[in-house]
């Protein structure tokens, strides 16, 4: 069979862009996008994306050029996930909650040629552009009015080249979109959140995004024509690749500019939402919403981004949400590990089910392999649920590498074929992975490795605590000790004291894991996707000095 080799008919490049054309054929008259009073069908979305792609190409945007977008979860943001790569360009969705200085650095680093800007981010982008180096080329700006309002190109300032509507109106609906020459061609550029360090440019190819999109649908068991609520920002790892996934299954995208628990519950009731995604902070918001009542119909919710406390999972599911839990990174374009549920677990007590579901799980069906290894030797750690190691993985959705950072790429993607995530975890005897911390968040107290996540889980079980995060505080004797930052629920008649919270932890944790310090905050600092920015809290803890300077050295 040596003569049987790949041929053009069997090696068409894998790309998720074809999902849109199929959606227009199969689900043409079905609703694709809803945003306030605005709605489109899949035929209309397909036509709009072709017009937009043709206009982008007519501006001199070539294969490999970066096109950026600064916008929330509005219809234009959804359309650009197709239109930009359909023009042969690389989509760069920018976190709109970043400050102007950081945005300026990212845009300059990416050499972005064109930037689509939501009308509420006008001042932000102009400030960012003003911070460009003097000799640096400035990208052209496209103004995006809110489609639910009467905004048009007359609102444009001289800084903007044209409006989004202009590009749609003058585009060619018969445009032949640019098929990648190779499935390995770059399609997406995302920057990491910067929760632990400076953001890095992560490049994904058409093949990787295709694999992640299909994998996400299979693993979550997404049916045809779901109603999907956009609570997860599309600028965060491209919404875990669900923009393309919703086209593949002909779903309805319910777009939201912003949300809170009241808006979410209203959207669920109004549109019959079946699916949504969000970080554990969204689950915490929903489960603590004033006057929340159990849902009349089940809503599937996928959570990831941080290890969810089992207490939060328990409260959320008691309201009628069916929670699925996964794990992924910007570098994997979405979730590559999920807590695959076993039927026999249904018969366990609710608290035990929540504990099992809080584990990250096993590799998804299209993820080649995951493991937990000793970061020094590279050997797999014991599958005992307690031996810590670094989480490593390999698979088709892992990034091509970091933009303009060969050293960083080589450090994380080693010669032995593994991608080193920087996350610390354990492997349980049943083969399920559990994330314990980021490597920078592990607390080493008296020579013991201490998981901040385990302490946080206990804090979240306290009836008065809304949010909790634990970091290391310097200690002259122990090296480091746990320092807890908490925010309390609203409307408490009696607020717990630091001593009471410490006593609560002492009743449920080994002595060395009990926080020596509890700091009360109105709200914890978070990224736009709900991840607590622990580097800010670590700086605060360091500023407190030693926890036991001149004090008792005994373990609590």
Swiss-Prot record:
It is found in: Cytoplasm, Cytosol. ATP binds at residues 192-200, 325-330, 423, 435-438, 531. PROSITE patterns: AMP_BINDING. Residues 260-325 are annotated as: SBD1. Residues 326-402 are annotated as: SBD2. Keywords: ATP-binding, Cytoplasm, Ligase, Nucleotide-binding. Transmembrane segments: none annotated. Pathway: Secondary metabolite biosynthesis. It is an enzyme of class 6 (ligase). GO terms for molecular function: 2-methylbutanoate-CoA ligase activity; ATP binding; CoA-ligase activity; medium-chain fatty acid-CoA ligase activity; propionate-CoA ligase activity. CDD domains: ttLC_FACS_AEE21_like. The keyword Iron-sulfur does not apply. It catalyses: 2-methylpropanoate + ATP + CoA = 2-methylpropanoyl-CoA + AMP + diphosphate; propanoate + ATP + CoA = propanoyl-CoA + AMP + diphosphate; butanoate + ATP + CoA = butanoyl-CoA + AMP + diphosphate; 2-methylbutanoate + ATP + CoA = 2-methylbutanoyl-CoA + AMP + diphosphate. Mostly expressed in old leaves and in cones and glandular trichomes (lupulin glands) after flowering, and, to a lower extent, in stems, young leaves and flowers. Both substrate-binding domains (SBD1 and SBD2) are involved in the substrate recognition, and are sufficient to confer the substrate specificity. Involved in the biosynthesis of prenylated phenolics natural products which contribute to the bitter taste of beer and display broad biological activities. Catalyzes the ligation of CoA on 2-methylpropanoate (isobutyric acid) and 2-methylbutanoate to produce 2-methylpropanoyl-CoA and 2-methylbutanoyl-CoA, respectively. Can also use propanoate and butanoate as substrates with a lower efficiency. This is 2-methylpropanoate--CoA ligase CCL4. It comes from Humulus lupulus (European hop).
